[in-house]
Amino acid sequence: MKKIILMAFIALFCFSNSVNAKVISNEKIDNAKVETASKIIADLQKDMQNFTKKGSGPFVAAIYDDKGNLIVKVANSVVNEQCSNNHAEMNAIKAAEKKLGTFDLAPYNLKLYVTAEPCMMCLGGIMWSGIKEVYYSVPSKSVEEITGFDEGFKPHWFKEFKKRGIIVYGNIETELGEQELHNYVNNGKKIYKPSR
């Protein structure tokens, strides 16, 4: 009997076509959340080239309310606005705060969707903004390997966000996101980082 149960578990684990096979989270995986995030993030990734043609960096973020309404969608603007903290996540937070007329987004139960794992700076901005949920695509390690960007030191951030009531889902639609990052690099776009 144990052998049958073990075989069934192995078959289920190895051959599952689950939408969240590679997805990670700081809560029990919710397939409905992953499905919604997959659609939104795939759309953001498709918009990436439109933004990079206008001088933006290869990262796009959007903030939605808990009813699924888009609040803002923006891109990284470090190079075209000459400001090192204008990452997509930070720009999205600033735009949402301005649109909603507040520095505290917590009462709005907002969700941030972004084409790559937030860097060290953006994690602080997200935490202090009051965003309730974060969904990202390409993990930092892949971003660094593909582009050479420095994503910073981020120990145990999933746990730290959970302690603060912030839900995180990652590694959503990574293949398309990685492809867009490769396109950015292969087209000779600016890799911006401090000269140390």
Locate each region found by the language model.
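Short beta-strand scaffold segments in enzyme catalytic cores
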Residues: F59-D65
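Short, glycine-anchored, charge-dense loop/turn motifs used at functional sites
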Residues: D65-I71
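Bacterial N-terminal signal peptides
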Residues: M7-C14
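Immediate flanking context of iron-sulfur cluster ligation sites
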Residues: L105-A116
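Short beta->alpha transition motifs characteristic of CBS
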Residues: I71-V79
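A short, polar/charged loop-to-alpha-helix boundary motif
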Residues: V79-N91
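Positively charged n-region of N-terminal signal peptides that target proteins for export
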Residues: M1-I4
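Zinc-dependent deaminase
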Residues: I10, N20-F51, P118, G125-R196
